[in-house]
Amino acid sequence: MSELQQVRNAKGDRIAIVMGLRTPFAKQATAFHGVSALDMGKMVVNELLSRSELDPKEIEQLVYGQVVQMPAAPNIAREIVLGTGMNVSTDAYSVTRACATSFQSTVNVAESIMTGNIEIGIAGGADSSSVLPIGVSKKLAHALVDLNKARSFGQKWAIIRRLGLKDLLPVPPAVAEYSTGLSMGQTAEQMAKTYNISRADQDALAHRSHTLATETWDSGHLRDEVMVAHVPPYKSFIDRDNNIRENSSLDSYAKLRPAFDRKHGSVTAANSTPLTDGASAVLLMSESRAKALGYEPIGYIKSYAFSAIDVWQDMLMGPSYATPLALKRAGMELEDLTLIEMHEAFAAQTLANMQMFASKKFAKEKLGRDRAIGEIDMTKFNVLGGSLAYGHPFAATGTRLITQVCRELKRRGGGTGLATACAAGGLGAAMIVEVE
């Protein structure tokens, strides 16, 4: 029995990535301050439909994701359908897989096309770190429920007297893993120590990322995949990612103090991704439908895989587990790839995964493989810069990676590319695309 993944529908059509688009990515509380993930999602989907010149009513399914949930609009996908002119009957649902969320939404739409349920769909994700669901303490939440049930003034006063001043303080969304209490930064620090990754190497990777991203923007390569976003009340706009250090100097990175282990650490704000706002989306179709409508797809999905490992130690190793699965399902080896796009959540996490790609010991002990995944050729790796420079709106990063690798392959004349990411919860995602 063949181990190759058949990413096709019953007619033999491949799954076409017709077009991809994103907003510029903005640091927390800057250009998108006050703009919700839902509003950014509607913004990018509207623009995607406009650029594709596709009637919104042709969309049969929309799967969209968000990591930092909005209690007021928990099904972001449905709200996007209602706010972008699609049929009210359009199938829409929301997903979340931490930083791999829009990998998941893309796969869900692709699988709907593979089964023949639909021929046209949109996938993507959005997150805002500027519009946050600020909560209340557990004690206050408990008291508010009790107050709702209380009838007399005496009952209500007794409930109020249970509360102290600290119980009234707002509670921001958790930045730590629910099961371990560890933040992503603490995990990156773990990985730096486990794999002996130096501060100098982390800073060098961050400097490379910012330098390449600056060159990419200056060359104009991103203009067709990043929209101009006009921000309510429409007196300003953003047309470029604002986290990129356009005059990055390697010497300047050494000036920052460690952020998560003040005494012995090496992970800093400069070699980590910042909290970021943004949205992205891709338009997917069956190959025959795309060609019948006159589109030239930017790529096709060849294979995909997800992985999960333990969360207590070095949990951001997802690319090292998901990538070999995707390669096997595509019938490929790492050296067969034309380009590699790996999410750079932290320089330490990225370098740890790169190190384990080349490790025979890791391959044998963790993956059950006879050979290493392969040593990464840096001339193929994150050639336009990565998340350290562009930023990381959690749910939007997956479709940013997929679009970026497809468009760069197209610009170079075609080939195959890998997009891969780690994610909270010990999760990983990988997708191989082919471009003609």
From Swiss-Prot:
GO MF term (any one): acetyl-CoA C-acyltransferase activity
Function: Catalyzes the final step of fatty acid oxidation in which acetyl-CoA is released and the CoA ester of a fatty acid two carbons shorter is formed.
Main subcellular location of this protein, as a coarse class: cytoplasm
Keywords: Acyltransferase, Cytoplasm, Fatty acid metabolism, Lipid degradation, Lipid metabolism, Transferase
Protein name: 3-ketoacyl-CoA thiolase
PROSITE patterns membership: THIOLASE_2, THIOLASE_3
Gene Ontology CC entries for this record: cytosol
Keyword presence, Acetylation: no
Pathway, per record: Lipid metabolism; fatty acid beta-oxidation
Any GO BP: fatty acid beta-oxidation
Catalysed reaction equations from the record: an acyl-CoA + acetyl-CoA = a 3-oxoacyl-CoA + CoA
Subunit structure as annotated in this protein's UniProt entry: Heterotetramer of two alpha chains (FadJ) and two beta chains (FadI).
